[in-house]
Regions:
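Cleft-lining beta-strand/loop regions that shape enzyme active-site pockets
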Residues: 1-85
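C-terminal recognition in membrane/secretory proteostasis and scaffolding
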Residues: 2, 13, 88, 188-193, ...
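Active-site proximal loops enriched in glycine and acidic residues that flank catalytic Cys/His/Asp
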Residues: 14-16, 44-46, 59, 66-68, ...
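Short glycine/threonine-rich loop-to-helix capping motif typified by GTGT followed
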Residues: 21-26, 158-161, 203-205
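Charged, glycine-interspersed solvent-exposed loop segments at helix/strand-loop junctions
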Residues: 83, 87-168, 172-182
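Intrinsic disorder and flexible/low-complexity segments
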Residues: 122, 194-250
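C-terminal intrinsically disordered, low-complexity extensions immediately downstream
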Residues: 172-205
Length: 250
């Protein structure tokens, strides 16, 4: 997209509570590189928090809905410890390693103090990088960002007052800004990834995964959503730039 001359501007739609801190940094670099060739306008959906804000802060313009949940500038580390469970069911294991950090992150035992210190160092460095990215992207000082960071979550309306967001509105507002920046008429909007038709989507569905998910849903009931969140966290890296709660509005 960066080198496609037919693409004059990019509207990046962000609707995410965040995720892997490493992935957020990689996407931040990609957006920054794209920005050197053409305007990048971020349009925020329901969420653009933590990692969602991380990848947004470098854009030329950020547009959020008044009710968007954004900010949450912070990261955390979470390593499950299943030793109590394995002891309960009588499961034991042995480890052979070359040095004391070789099995760092092993969920079969609790962290020792050295590992806790190492994880804390990784979190501290990651947080400093996050704050630095926000300061650079928003043309603010690190001190100013730190006053509104530390994981605080803001609505789009408040975020605009704090300087984290430029404009209030939806994706149409973001498109208008993109068009104005490049001064074109008679444009066509192309969405990525391209939507699949029903048949293609059905053929791409793995029957085994679908059956398993339906069985789990029937067994877990209202807890299925929480199970999905935990499963998602377990599959991602140990350092997360993610809003640390799940909203359920009824």
């Amino acid at each position: 997209m960066k080198d496609n001359d037919d693409v004059k501007a990019v509207v990046l739609r962000v609707n995410s509570p965040g995720g892997s801190a490493f992935a957020s940094e990689q996407i931040w670099h990609a957006v920054k590189e794209l920005k050197t060739k053409k305007p990048v306008i971020v349009s925020m959906g329901d969420y653009a928090a933590s990692g969602g804000y991380y990848i947004s802060c470098v854009a030329d313009t950020i547009v959020a809905e008044p009710t968007t949940l954004t900010g949450s500038i912070g990261i955390f580390g979470m390593i499950p410890n299943v030793k109590g469970l394995t002891d309960k069911i009588g499961l034991s294991y042995d480890v052979v390693k070359t040095n004391k950090y070789a099995d760092f992150g092993n969920i079969m035992r609790p962290f020792n103090e050295d590992e806790k210190s190492l994880l804390q160092m990784m979190i501290t460095e990651g947080y400093d990088t996050f704050v630095t990215r926000c300061a650079e992207g928003r043309h603010m000082t690190k001190e100013a960002i730190e006053k509104i960071a530390e994981g605080r979550v803001w609505t789009g309306e408040t975020a605009k007052e704090l300087g984290l967001v430029d404009e209030l509105g939806g994706i149409d507002k973001a498109l208008d800004i993109a068009v104005a920046k490049v001064g074109i008429e008679g444009y066509t909007v192309v969405s990525y990834p391209e939507k699949q038709d029903f048949l293609s989507s059905l053929l791409d569905t793995k029957p085994t995964n679908y059956v398993e998910s339906q069985l789990l849903k029937s067994k877990l009931g209202e807890y299925y959503q929480q199970f999905g969140l935990l499963k998602n966290l377990q599959e991602q890296s140990m350092i997360q730039a993610r809003i640390p709660f799940e909203l359920n509005i009824k």
